[in-house]
Amino acid sequence: MKIQLIAVGTKMPAWVKTGFEEYQRRFPKDMPFELIEITAGKRGKNADIARILEQEGKAMLTACGKNKIVTLDIPGKSWTTHQLAQQLESWKNDGRDVSLLIGGPEGLSPECKAAAEQSWSLSPLTLPHPLVRVVVAESLYRAWSLTANHPYHRE
């Protein structure tokens, strides 16, 4: 199973790239984890936000292909580390690749939300999108370590 993190935004601070890549490289070869960045629509004082969301959403869904789609969204379901490990196993047993979607400043398009089979909430707080990339990478690596009996996660 391959996991894709599809995120709106291409100009992230260096610490985001470093943090994401630190966990990305730890994933096993049979579970590659890749980041796909979607160029954010141009926002300005008179920007048509609905149109921008639609364009970003279309690009995200195209990148997903036939993968299982999981959105990252505040109203989604929150999981403990053990529950995330169970989700990871369930996704693996499903036999499909998984695309996790992180929206831009205004969130995800209605089309992305409608296409999602699951929605995952990291927190009821609004988190900066660059930080979410690193938190998701670490959380998934920790969940994988539980399923593989790797010593990374400690109770």
UniProtKB/Swiss-Prot annotation:
NCBIfam families: PRK00103.1-1, PRK00103.1-4, tRNA_RlmH_YbeA. Homodimer. The gene is rlmH. It is found in: Cytoplasm. It comes from Actinobacillus succinogenes (strain ATCC 55618 / DSM 22257 / CCUG 43843 / 130Z). Gene3D superfamilies: 3.40.1280.10. One of its GO terms (cellular component) is cytoplasm. InterPro entries: Alpha/beta_knot_MTases (IPR029028), RlmH-like (IPR003742), tRNA_m1G_MTases_N (IPR029026). HAMAP family: 23SrRNA_methyltr_H. SUPFAM superfamilies: alpha/beta knot (SSF75217). This is Ribosomal RNA large subunit methyltransferase H. It is an enzyme of class 2 (transferase). Belongs to the RNA methyltransferase RlmH family. Its EC number is 2.1.1.177. S-adenosyl-L-methionine binds at L72, G103, L122, S123, P124, L125, T126, L127. Keywords: Cytoplasm, Methyltransferase, rRNA processing, S-adenosyl-L-methionine, Transferase.
